[in-house]
Amino acid sequence: ALGRRRVNAPNQTVYRMAGLDPSDVDVLQVYDAFSPLVLLSLERLGFCGTGEAADFVQDGRIELGGEIPVNTSGGMLSEGHLNGWSQMMEIVRQLRHQAGARQVPDAKVAQWGTALGDSIIFGNSDV
């Protein structure tokens, strides 16, 4: 079983491998089969501290136009539960600047992740 320390520690491996940190991410797609997973993912991926996600999302910080737009196509709760594939398609759209009204301006770096810390960072040719 995973200990509390292991689950709560932010996943820094993906950032170290990419040579980036959470502040470099322009758009974030997270596994959100259940609403609380968005909050847990923000904490686990290092966008805020443990126990701080509820405050972090206030004032539109994760909305389109916010500090870190999350699940710009609506996430699994809106699009359907395709185990993250629709989120991968949204990442490609964002990085190609083909997301239409959902486009994050000048998106260069996108991240996909889960509340357990699984994560992939993508970049376009502008990175």
Positions of PLM-derived features:
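Claisen-condensing/thiolase-fold acyl-transfer catalytic domains that form or cleave C-C bonds
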Residues: 1-127
